[in-house]
Amino acid sequence: MRNYPAHVLTLAAFLLIPLSESSADMITIDLSHPIPTFAPSEDDPMKADLSKPYLDSVPIPTFGGQAVLSFGTFPTSDGHFDLGTLVLSEHHGTHLDTPGHYVNDVTSLEPGGKRANERKLAHQLDASDLIGKLVMIDISGRVDTELAKNGGVPSPDINVTDFSNSSNNVVGADDITAIESKIDNGVWIVINSGWSRFYFSGTDFAKDPYINGFNHPGMNKAAVDKLIEIMDKKGVLIGGIVADNIGIDSGQSAVGDDDKWTNSWHAHVRLLQRGVKFVENAANLGQITMVANPDNCNIVVGAPKHVRGTGGPSRVLAICN
C-alpha cells in the first residue's frame, strides 16, 4: 500500500467527511481574486470592450488582455440555457505557473535543472502537484511601515517608498533561513505582503500602485538563492510558492537590469527549471496569518488541465485545521 503524506490524508479526509461534521474543525479561505469580464469588442471578438463591463468589473494588471465573455443560448420548451464563451490569458488573475512556463536557454539551465521539454505542463500535473502543507512568510508589517512614509500609498520612486532588493521591505535570505526547518518535499511557501489591497487600482505598469513601476515587494535574488541552497542541502523540493504580487519576484528582480529584461525574473529562471510551481496574484493571504496555527493549513490549487498549458487561472484555497 502506498504511504501518502500527511497533508494528502488531511485533504482526503476533508473531502470525504460531510461538511456538517468537518466545518466546525476546519477553516477554508479563498485565496483567489474574482476575474473581471467584459463584452467582446465589435471590431475584434477576441478583445474586450472596456466600456462594456459585466456587473462591477474593472480592468486589472495583466500581461495579456482583459477577459472577454460572450453568451449564446440553448432554448428549451421551458426557457433556455445561457452558454458563455470565455477568452483570457493563461497567466491572468490569480493563476498557476507550471514548471514549463519559463524556457531556459543554455546559459541559464543549471546542473540538476530540467530542459523545458522535460518539465510538467498543465495536463501533466497530478493531484499531489496541486496540494501541499503551507509554510508562511509574513512581511506585511514591514511593508506597512514603509508605506506609512507616504500615507499608505506606494510610490514608484524608491526614495519615497523603497521596495528594492537591498531594502528590508522584500523577502530576503533571512526570511528563508527563518523557515529552514519547515522546508520539505511538497510544501508550499506562502508570502503575505499585504499587497493584494492594490490589485484593483489600475493597469498602468509605470504608475498604478499594484505594479508601481516595478517597485513592489516579493522575493529578492538572495532569497531565491538561499531557498535553492537549503533545498539542495536537505535534498528536498518544495511544491510551490504563493504570493500576493504579480510574479513572485520583487519588482526589481522581475524587471532586471534594463528595459530589455536583462537578468530579469530571477525566481522564474532558477526555480521553475527545478520543478517548483508558482501561484501569482493571490488574495486574502492575511487571513491565513489570523488562524490559530498557520502550520496546520494546506494549499489546494484548482488549476485547469488543458493540454500543452503553461499555467492557468485558478481557484486557490487554504484549508486549515
Task: State where each predicted segment sits.
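Active-/binding-site microenvironments in catalytic and ligand-binding cores
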Residues: 22-321
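Bacterial N-terminal signal peptides
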Residues: 10-18
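Bacterial N-terminal signal peptides that target proteins for export
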Residues: 1-9
